[in-house]
């Protein structure tokens, strides 16, 4: 992978990630294909929304279908018929989400399979081996996602163990002679000094990119902004910056304003299945009865297949009848909305008009523009 940085506007950055399988324009949003599929969508449909890269999940793909089946197909690209870049999460966050059915030790994580209750062990080495089998273009280190709330001492111990796991991830990645890219993950909770220590340790090890982890786990939005404003300027400028698991459209805007290059989140697809649709004027709840006889498109400013071909009344009808097509059309729209937002942000950075773009975005949503800390 090669990262090119073209221009900046304030702290926002416009560039691209260049892989053998294709180029990813940044800032970029990655749709989530947890089980090797963006729910309800074919790869061609996902690509048509403007997506350059997808996210897959190591933990879930390890449990089902498993490494052996993946290798029989070649890798995850061949298995799911997506011949463009793929980033895979290491499984650390999913293990964190298991709660009481997992035990974390220095060696790794012991847990019971959420599928059949089988006892399983996952460590940095195994995570690297699974991601090697997946053929991930971007591999993430295995880390512990620091919970919120956590005391400074708890966050320090978690972060320092993640640093040791980062070293083990790097060593195993190199032992496997994996030709792809490996990203480190900055931890440390809501404590700036711990974030500093984490980043320094990761830079000393050396990675192809740096992710900010442990945010969007329940902390106030102000804390997320504070940590991003503190840590992003310290990440090496020639490396991509990835904010994991974020988020709402306004979170993407605020992340870009603070120098983030990459995002992922299940929100556009999950919300689509629940009838919550993002538009240029805010969120529309399509199952609301006021849409029952509305012949207008979902969003007149959207160029997606759904908006060009169907009315709000039809989408309401599909939702009320629990038709699968409704979830699919909603997903197409939400993913396209996210990609159009990223396209707008990239264009604004290129032309030095980001402040105006951000002001228009919040005005259309009926909200005030959050302040940046100098």
UniProtKB/Swiss-Prot annotation:
One of its GO terms (cellular component) is cytosol. Binds 1 zinc ion per subunit. GO terms for molecular function: metal ion binding; tRNA-guanosine(34) queuine transglycosylase activity. It holds the Pfam family TGT. Its cofactor is Zn(2+). Zn(2+) binds at residues 302, 304, 307, 333. Pathway: tRNA modification; tRNA-queuosine biosynthesis. It is an enzyme of class 2 (transferase). Its EC number is 2.4.2.29. Residues 245-251, 269-273 are annotated as: RNA binding. It catalyses: 7-aminomethyl-7-carbaguanine + guanosine(34) in tRNA = 7-aminomethyl-7-carbaguanosine(34) in tRNA + guanine. The active site is at residues 89, 264. Keywords: Glycosyltransferase, Metal-binding, Queuosine biosynthesis, Transferase, tRNA processing, Zinc. Substrate binds at residues 89-93, 143, 187, 214. One of its GO terms (biological process) is tRNA wobble guanine modification. Catalyzes the base-exchange of a guanine (G) residue with the queuine precursor 7-aminomethyl-7-deazaguanine (PreQ1) at position 34 (anticodon wobble position) in tRNAs with GU(N) anticodons (tRNA-Asp, -Asn, -His and -Tyr). Catalysis occurs through a double-displacement mechanism. The nucleophile active site attacks the C1' of nucleotide 34 to detach the guanine base from the RNA, forming a covalent enzyme-RNA intermediate. The proton acceptor active site deprotonates the incoming PreQ1, allowing a nucleophilic attack on the C1' of the ribose to form the product. Homodimer. Within each dimer, one monomer is responsible for RNA recognition and catalysis, while the other monomer binds to the replacement base PreQ1. Belongs to the queuine tRNA-ribosyltransferase family. This is Queuine tRNA-ribosyltransferase.
């Amino acid at each position: 992978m090669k990262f090119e940085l073209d221009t900046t506007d304030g702290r926002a950055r416009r560039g691209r990630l260049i892989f053998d399988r294709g180029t990813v324009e940044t800032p970029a949003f990655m749709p989530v294909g947890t089980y090797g599929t963006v729910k309800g969508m074919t790869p061609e449909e996902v690509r048509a929304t403007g997506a350059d890269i997808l996210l897959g999940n190591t933990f879930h793909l390890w449990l089902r279908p498993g490494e052996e089946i993946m290798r029989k197909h070649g890798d995850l690209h061949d298995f799911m018929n997506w011949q463009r870049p793929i980033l895979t999460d290491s499984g650390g966050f999913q293990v964190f989400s298991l709660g009481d059915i997992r035990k974390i030790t220095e060696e790794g994580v012991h847990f019971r399979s959420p599928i059949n209750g089988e006892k399983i062990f996952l460590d940095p080495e195994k995570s690297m081996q699974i991601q090697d089998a997946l053929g991930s273009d971007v591999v993430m280190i295995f880390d512990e996602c620091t919970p919120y709330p956590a005391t400074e001492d708890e966050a320090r111990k978690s972060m320092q163990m993640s640093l040791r796991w980062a070293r083990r991830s790097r060593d195993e990645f190199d032992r496997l002679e994996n030709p792809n890219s490996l990203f480190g993950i900055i931890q440390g909770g809501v404590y700036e000094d711990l974030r500093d220590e984490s980043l320094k340790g990761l830079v000393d090890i050396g990675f192809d990119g740096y992710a900010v982890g442990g945010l969007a786990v329940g902390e106030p939005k102000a804390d997320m902004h504070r940590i991003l404003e503190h840590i992003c300027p310290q990440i090496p400028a020639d490396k991509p910056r990835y904010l994991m698991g974020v988020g709402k459209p306004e979170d993407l805007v605020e992340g870009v304003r603070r120098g983030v290059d990459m995002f992922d989140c299940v929100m556009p697809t999950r919300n689509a299945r629940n009838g919550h649709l993002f538009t240029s004027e805010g969120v529309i709840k399509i199952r609301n009865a006021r849409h029952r006889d509305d012949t207008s498109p979902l969003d007149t400013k959207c160029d997606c297949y759904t908006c060009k071909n169907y009315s709000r009344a039809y989408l309401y009808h599909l939702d009320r009848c629990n038709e699968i097509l409704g979830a699919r059309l909603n997903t197409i729209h939400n993913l396209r909305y996210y990609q159009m937002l990223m396209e707008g942000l990239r264009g604004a950075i290129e032309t030095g008009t980001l402040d105006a773009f951000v002001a228009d975005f919040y005005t259309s949503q009926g909200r005030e523009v959050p302040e940046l800390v100098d």
